[in-house]
Amino acid sequence: MKRLIILFSLIFGLTATACSNGSTTGQPLVVGETPIAPESRLIDARPDWAAIPGEMAPDFSYTLADGTHKLSDLRGKLVIVNFWASWCLPCVEEMPTLDAARRTNPDLVILAVNRNESTEAISAFAPKVGVSFPLITDRDGAIGERYGVVNLPTTFFINRDGTIAVRHVGALTAERLAERLAEVR
């Protein structure tokens, strides 16, 4: 009987561990100069509509060390929402280009939304790229799904009025990024 209880406890513990999604809902953190948002939430959840140029960008919230923010709070600014993953080589290669654009354009806000990776994976990745814009966890993929993201990287350029100006699929070179930014200014 004692062995049966131990066996049951072991099976239960392993099952609970295997079913865990690996995410932690810890406090927002900063790795180097990179703010990391361990929690995000889709606000605009209309399932029948994918994000397309000319329409309002689907709203979402994210929590950083200085509080919870929403995409819609950034109206009046030029915003780039970039969907990426740490295993995606083109995503990694374009990060310095995005960071350089943010540093040279004070009114540009970049939100890098990670598709389906844990906060721990993002925290381990952050020092490798050393960007100054937030890396946002989209652990369940709801934000990316709402934006209709299939391939990575996918980048949305959002006008100051909150509408999507451009959807770009694939890595951005410095030249292509400058062209896209010129389209939305």
Name each model feature, range by range.
Residues 124-132, 138-184:
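Thiol/disulfide oxidoreductase modules built on the thioredoxin-like
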Residues 49-54, 59-79:
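A short beta-strand-turn-helix
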Residues 1-58:
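N-terminal targeting signals for export/organelle localization
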Residues 80-81, 110:
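Hydrophobic beta-strand anchors of alpha/beta hydrolase catalytic cores
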Residues 75-77, 107, 131-132, 149:
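Active-site acidic short loop of glycosyltransferases
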Residues 75, 83-100:
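Conserved redox-active cysteine motifs that mediate thiol-disulfide chemistry
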